UniProtKB/Swiss-Prot annotation:
HAMAP family: Ribosomal_uS5_B. Keywords: Ribonucleoprotein, Ribosomal protein, RNA-binding, rRNA-binding. This is Small ribosomal subunit protein uS5. Signal peptide: none annotated. GO terms for cellular component: cytosolic small ribosomal subunit.
């Protein structure tokens, strides 16, 4: 499991995993490679991509392109989360909660990469169930997408932010 990082313009790109896969055909096995990447602007935008090709660089390039096309906005609160959130994808479950300044990113493997490129600086998190990188990344992005800022909740309920926060 490698973790390569690049800066392109204002986007941070991270390579989470490269995997060799094979397809068995009559004449033998056809080898190819898959790559899982995440990109983010470090300020609340994050996306992931999964690419597959006969060569590693081509797989990584495809994954990066897909990640750039597949970005979501995340409502951050001064470098941490708005509230505790849960995310699920197939067998992976993730739980993340806001942390005070100076805590850092307490997260493992694939989840850490997603949180870093999203711009989260302080968070406590835990992955339960399957720790397959693809499923963990999807669950993490699901959790971040489900996070709502007080402004979003207030607008939805037709109230002011002060009424929501108490």
């Amino acid at each position: 499991m490698s973790n390569i990082e690049k800066q392109v313009g204002e986007l941070q790109e991270k390579l989470i995993a490269v995997n060799r896969v094979s397809k068995t055909v009559k004449g033998g096995r056809i080898m190819s490679f898959t790559a899982l990447t995440v990109v983010g602007d470090g300020n609340g935008r994050v996306g992931f991509g999964y690419g597959k090709a006969r060569e590693v660089p081509a797989a990584i390039q495809k994954a990066m392109e897909k990640a750039r096309r597949n970005m979501i906005n995340v409502a951050l609160n001064e470098g941490t989360l708005q509230h505790p959130v849960k995310g699920v994808h197939t067998g992976s479950r993730v739980f993340m909660q806001p942390a005070s300044e100076g805590t850092g990113i307490i997260a493992g493997g694939a989840m850490r990469a997603v949180l870093e490129v999203a711009g989260v600086r302080n968070v406590l998190s835990k992955a339960y169930g399957s720790t397959n990188p693809i499923n963990v990344v999807r669950a993490t992005i699901d959790a971040l997408a489900n996070m709502k800022s007080p402004e979003m909740v207030a607008a939805k309920r037709g109230k002011t932010v002060d009424e929501i926060l108490g």
